[in-house]
C-alpha cells in the first residue's frame, strides 16, 4: 500500500485538472490512501471520489509562503510516501526539506517552463515528446518516466437523453453534428475550425450540418464575433462550459480537435470513450495518439481548407466514421485503460521508494 498526496494549484477544469481527479480517485479505489489538495473553489472538487481525502490550501501564487508552510504541515501531518504535484504552481510551492521524507514527483502534461520543475525528485510526462523535452533540458534520463493519461468508462446514454439534448439545442432530428470542445484559447485553434465550418455547405446528403462548441475562455467573445461575421449563427450552438460534457460527445457524429498546439489531447481520449469519430490536427499530441485511418483522421495545423475537406469527407461516410470510432475505442482499451495507468503509477511509486530506501 502506498500513501500518495496529490496537489494542484489551479481552479480550472482543463485536462490536467480532470486527470488529477481521475488518478486520485482511481488510486484511492484500489485501496491506496490518497489525499488531494486543491485551492478553495476549485471546480474539480466534485469530481473526486468518495475514497479520496480532501483538503484546501490557497496557493494564491508561486510566492505564497503561507501556502508553502501549509503544504509542509499537511505532509508532516499526513505522512505520505509520495507527493505528486501537477502544473507549475503546486510544484514550486512544494518544497521538501530533505530526502528523508516522501518522494516528490512532478507530473507534466505540457511543455512548461523548465525552471518550475527542478525541485522534484522525479518527473512523469504523459507523452514521449515531453519526456524528450525534459531530458533535452538536462533532467536526468533515469528519473524521467512516461505514463499516459486515461479516461473513465462513461455511462451509456440512451435515445431519450439524445432527444432531450437535441430539443434543448434546437437542432433538427436528421442533422449532422460536429463537436468542438475545450478552452476557448488561441492555442486550441477554434478560429480555424469556425473558418473551416464556414466552408461546409449548409446541407450534406440531404442532412443539415450543425456545429456545437462546448467551452469557455478568453477568446469567447472574439470567436462569437467571428461566427457572426461568417454568418454561422443559425447553425452554431454555444452551450458554454459543461461540468459533464458526456452528452455532447454522445450526440456528435464527429469530434474535431483543431488545436495549433496540443501536447496531448484529452478530448481525443474522451471522444474515443464515447465511440465518437475523431478528426484532429497534427499537433505533437495528435500525432502521438492517432494512427491516421485507423483510430482517427489528421490534417495539418492551421489549415482551414484541409480541415473543411476532411469534415466533409467524414460526414458523408458513415462507415468510415464508425470504423474510426471503433479503432479509437480499441486504442483506448489497450493503451489508455484505467487499470493499466494506475498499475504503471503504483509500480513507479514502489520503484522510487525502493531506490530511496537504498540510498
Regions inferred by a protein language model and the residue ranges of each:
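A short, well-ordered alpha-helix in the C-terminal region of glycosyltransferases
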Residues: 167, 224, 313, 320-335, ...
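N-terminal strand-loop element at the rim of the active site
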Residues: 6-14, 18-67, 74
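Carbohydrate-associated surface elements
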Residues: 129, 150
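Conserved acidic donor-binding segment of nucleotide-sugar-dependent glycosyltransferases
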Residues: 291-293, 297-304, 313-319
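Aromatic "clamp/platform" in nucleotide-sugar-dependent glycosyltransferases that forms part
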Residues: 241, 260
Amino acid at each position: 500500500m502506498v500513501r500518495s498526496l496529490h496537489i494542484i494549484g489551479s481552479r480550472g477544469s482543463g485536462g490536467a485538472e480532470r486527470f488529477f481527479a481521475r488518478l486520485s480517485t482511481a488510486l484511492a479505489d484500489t485501496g491506496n490512501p490518497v489525499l488531494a489538495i486543491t485551492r478553495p473553489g476549485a471546480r474539480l472538487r466534485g469530481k473526486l471520489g468518495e475514497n479520496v481525502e480532501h483538503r484546501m490550501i490557497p496557493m494564491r501564487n508561486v510566492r505564497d509562503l503561507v501556502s508553502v508552510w501549509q503544504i509542509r504541515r499537511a505532509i508532516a501531518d499526513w505522512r505520505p510516501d509520495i507527493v505528486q504535484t501537477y502544473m507549475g504552481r503546486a510544484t514550486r510551492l512544494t518544497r521538501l526539506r530533505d530526502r528523508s521524507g516522501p518522494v516528490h514527483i512532478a507530473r507534466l502534461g505540457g511543455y512548461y517552463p523548465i525552471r518550475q520543475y527542478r525541485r522534484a525528485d522525479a518527473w512523469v510526462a504523459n507523452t514521449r515528446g515531453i519526456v524528450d523535452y525534459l531530458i533535452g533540458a538536462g533532467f536526468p534520463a533515469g528519473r524521467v518516466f512516461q505514463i499516459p493519461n486515461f479516461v473513465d468508462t462513461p455511462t451509456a446514454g440512451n435515445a431519450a437523453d439524445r432527444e432531450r439534448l437535441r430539443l434543448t439545442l434546437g437542432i433538427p432530428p436528421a442533422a449532422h453534428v460536429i463537436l468542438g470542445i475545450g478552452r476557448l484559447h488561441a492555442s486550441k485553434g477554434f478560429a480555424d475550425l469556425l473558418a473551416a465550418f464556414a466552408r461546409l455547405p449548409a446541407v450534406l446528403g440531404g442532412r443539415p450540418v450543425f456545429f456545437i462548441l462546448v467551452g469557455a475562455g478568453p477568446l469567447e467573445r472574439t470567436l462569437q464575433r467571428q461566427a457572426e461575421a461568417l454568418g454561422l449563427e443559425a447553425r452554431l450552438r454555444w452551450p458554454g462550459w459543461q461540468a459533464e460534457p458526456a452528452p455532447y460527445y454522445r450526440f456528435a457524429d464527429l469530434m474535431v480537435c483543431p488545436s495549433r498546439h496540443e501536447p496531448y489531447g484529452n478530448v481525443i481520449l474522451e471522444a474515443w470513450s464515447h465511440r465518437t469519430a475523431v478528426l484532429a490536427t497534427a499537433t505533437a499530441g495528435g500525432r502521438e495518439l492517432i494512427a491516421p485511418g485507423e483510430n482517427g483522421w489528421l490534417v495539418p495545423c492551421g489549415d482551414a481548407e484541409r480541415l473543411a475537406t476532411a469534415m466533409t469527407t467524414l460526414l458523408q461516410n458513415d462507415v468510415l466514421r464508425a470504423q474510426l470510432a471503433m479503432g479509437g475505442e480499441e486504442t483506448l482499451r489497450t493503451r489508455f485503460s484505467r487499470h493499466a495507468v494506475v498499475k504503471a503509477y503504483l509500480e513507479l511509486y514502489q520503484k522510487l521508494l525502493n531506490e530511496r530506501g537504498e540510498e
